[in-house]
């Protein structure tokens, strides 16, 4: 990219080289990590703007620094656009990450030791949903729910049973590796019956929700958190949506509760991404993500891979690689060597450790952003099958050639040299 040569290379060749190498990796490998995506040039430019220079503690119209009149415009644009996008009453666009957004809701509504019901990490949940190694699991009494051992889907009757037994202050829904639709309306019924608050972390599916391809949690949840990247295709960051009655508590939890100055250049990039998501073409893009995931999942199944829960309703799938005599760790390494990037991932009731795993997680947002279609998904499935079924140099060479051909056919940032 020109800016690397023009601005970074003369000042810091070591950093310039690392950025250039990462650019090459993104261009010439197939990105299938479900939580990653490629932002637009407009989002990238906004994040690299002069707004990175501005401190703006507080909120629009109520800052602790002068000179905030223009960053106020940017933050207001981000808030109003995302409220329109999801039909929310209140939005806080300042969280630096999804983890910060989740922590802020806990900080606003819970006291240390309060009971919370959240999805088991090994069944597809997230670290911030009560993992004992995360602050959420250290500060609060999380009770885990998971998926049925046979269907590998959430059993809402079991969730109800746990909720009525433990009477949690908060029920958390959402996942980082769950390939099926989540019934937020049903979970709100359970929360009401248990006299619990209800929070949805829609980080992975926010883009699908915005496009109307997944049930919108906003009408059902007291709080909705998300990242702004992944399927939403914005910059890396977080977001909280809530009902107006909780607005002050949420805003205070972010600032001055757990953060200081907001990252105004990132908020500008969020505003641009929300603007993009409001356009009709974003809906078509999300439809392609889901269609690509379905075809990729079905094609892998045809080639002998077991797909957790039997398929996917969204942008991701979990693939059990034991049928190929491999662990998830081994499969991730083999695929990376041929230019396909995935991540090892536990599958429900996994006998292997989280650092080894029996599965890999695959997602289609990034390849869809490159313009890849269902035919390309079939080619990707073939390359994955060859690489993992023939873990030798001959198989690797075939897979590399297929990856190279796909990357050439669907270039990343083609007009950016």
Swiss-Prot record:
Cofactor(s) it depends on: pyridoxal 5'-phosphate
Signal peptide boundaries: none
Keywords: Amino-acid biosynthesis, Cytoplasm, One-carbon metabolism, Pyridoxal phosphate, Transferase
Sample GO molecular function, one term: glycine hydroxymethyltransferase activity
Record's keyword annotation contains Ribonucleoprotein: no
Site (Plays an important role in substrate specificity): 229
EC number(s) reported in the record: 2.1.2.1
A single GO cellular-component term on record: cytosol
Catalysis performed (reactions): (6R)-5,10-methylene-5,6,7,8-tetrahydrofolate + glycine + H2O = (6S)-5,6,7,8-tetrahydrofolate + L-serine
Cell location: Cytoplasm
Entry-linked Pfam families: SHMT
InterPro entries cross-referenced by the UniProt entry: PyrdxlP-dep_Trfase (IPR015424), PyrdxlP-dep_Trfase_major (IPR015421), PyrdxlP-dep_Trfase_small (IPR015422), Ser_HO-MeTrfase (IPR001085), Ser_HO-MeTrfase-like (IPR049943), Ser_HO-MeTrfase_PLP_BS (IPR019798), SHMT-like_dom (IPR039429)
Primary subcellular site in the record, as a coarse category: cytoplasm
Binding site for (6S)-5,6,7,8-tetrahydrofolate: 121, 125-127, 245
Gene Ontology terms describing biological process: glycine biosynthetic process from serine; tetrahydrofolate interconversion
Metabolic or biological pathway, per its Swiss-Prot or TrEMBL entry: One-carbon metabolism; tetrahydrofolate interconversion; Amino-acid biosynthesis; glycine biosynthesis; glycine from L-serine: step 1/1
Domain of life the protein comes from: Bacteria
Modified positions (N6-(pyridoxal phosphate)lysine) in chain numbering: 230
Family classification: Belongs to the SHMT family.
Functional note: Catalyzes the reversible interconversion of serine and glycine with tetrahydrofolate (THF) serving as the one-carbon carrier. This reaction serves as the major source of one-carbon groups required for the biosynthesis of purines, thymidylate, methionine, and other important biomolecules. Also exhibits THF-independent aldolase activity toward beta-hydroxyamino acids, producing glycine and aldehydes, via a retro-aldol mechanism.
Subunit details: Homodimer.
Protein name: Serine hydroxymethyltransferase
The gene coding this protein: glyA
């Amino acid at each position: 990219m020109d800016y690397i040569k023009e601005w970074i290379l003369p000042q810091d060749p070591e950093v310039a080289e690392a950025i250039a190498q990462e650019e090459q990796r993104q261009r010439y490998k197939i990105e299938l990590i479900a939580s990653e995506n490629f932002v637009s040039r407009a989002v990238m430019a906004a994040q690299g703007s002069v707004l990175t220079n501005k401190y703006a503690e507080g909120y629009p119209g109520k800052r602790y620094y002068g000179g905030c009149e223009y960053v106020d415009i940017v933050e207001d644009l981000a808030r109003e656009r995302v409220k329109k996008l999801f039909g929310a009453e209140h939005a806080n666009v300042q969280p630096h990450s999804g983890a910060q957004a989740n922590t802020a809701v806990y900080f606003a509504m819970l006291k240390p030791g309060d009971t919370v019901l959240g999805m088991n990490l090994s069944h597809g949940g997230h670290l911030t949903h009560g993992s004992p190694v995360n602050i959420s699991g250290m500060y609060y009494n999380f009770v885990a729910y998971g998926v049925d051992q046979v269907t590998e889907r959430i059993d809402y009757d079991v969730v109800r049973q746990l909720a009525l037994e433990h009477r949690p202050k908060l029920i958390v829904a959402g996942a980082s590796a769950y390939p099926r639709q989540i019934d937020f309306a049903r979970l709100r019924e359970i929360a009401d019956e248990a006299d619990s608050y209800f929070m949805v972390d829609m980080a992975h599916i926010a883009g699908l929700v915005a496009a109307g391809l997944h049930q919108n949690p906003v009408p059902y949840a007291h709080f909705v958190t998300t990242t702004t990247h992944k399927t939403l295709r914005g910059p890396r960051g977080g977001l909280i949506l809530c009902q107006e009655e909780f607005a002050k508590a949420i805003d205070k939890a972010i600032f001055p509760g757990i953060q200081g100055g907001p990252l105004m250049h990132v908020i500008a990039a969020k505003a641009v991404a929300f603007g993009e998501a409001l356009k009709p073409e974003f809906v078509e893009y999300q439809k392609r993500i889901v269609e690509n995931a379905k075809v990729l999942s079905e094609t892998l199944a045809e080639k002998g891979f077991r797909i957790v829960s039997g398929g996917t309703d969204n942008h991701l799938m979990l693939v059990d690689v034991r049928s190929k005599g491999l662990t998830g760790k081994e499969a991730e390494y083999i695929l990376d060597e041929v230019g396909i990037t995935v991540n090892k991932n536990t599958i429900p009731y996994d006998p292997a450790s989280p650092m080894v795993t029996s599965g890999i997680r695959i997602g289609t947002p990034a390849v869809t952003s490159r313009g890849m279609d269902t035919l390309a998904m079939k080619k990707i499935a073939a390359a994955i099958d060859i690489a993992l079924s023939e873990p030798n140099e001959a198989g690797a060479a075939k897979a590399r050639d297929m990856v190279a051909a796909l990357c050439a056919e669907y270039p990343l940032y083609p007009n950016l040299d």
